[in-house]
Amino acid sequence: NLLDIGYFRLGFYWFPFEKSYPRKQKRDHIFKDGTKIDYAIQLYYFDFDLRNSFLRYISRVEINFRTKLIYMASNKYKEDPFWYVNSKYVEKSFLNSKAFQDAIRDANTETIVKQDLNRYSRSHAPAWKVLEYLSFGVVISLFDNLKDGGLKHAISMEYGMGSSTQFSNYMNTIRRLRNFCAHGKVL
């Protein structure tokens, strides 16, 4: 088991079994009477299973949010399937940001997007193709940088929230939890 988990990683799970717990400074690494290494291993596997459970449901939230953003914005801006790169609809500072530019460049390398760009000889594919390949964080930032407060409000209301700022805060909290889970951090 130790080779499966790693000594350093398992150390995070020993902490609750130490006499010095919850004190983080000057830990003495002396275990409470009756403590077995299996307790830390069991805690590790519980944490592992919990992270995977969270990921299962967070994935559904992420896909649902992405779908609603694409659907609602694309229906509002029917005349412009490339609304996600148009400064008429999205803050110019965001469109010019390195993070967004890099995300679009990466999305353009995906087979479906590349085929669209080549087939129609254009520099951008429609939102419903490209946004599928953007990270959750970039999609949230795109939402945050929409110029139309009414659209942001309507999307937020789909989740029962009247404030798009509060909704964005919730989505960013979910994103951080997702990243913790996806990268194996200790919950």
What is the role of each PLM region?
Residues 184:
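Acidic/aromatic/glycine-rich contiguous surface patches that form carbohydrate-binding/processing clefts
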Residues 1-176:
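Extended intrinsically disordered or low-complexity regions, especially N/C-terminal cytosolic tails and loops
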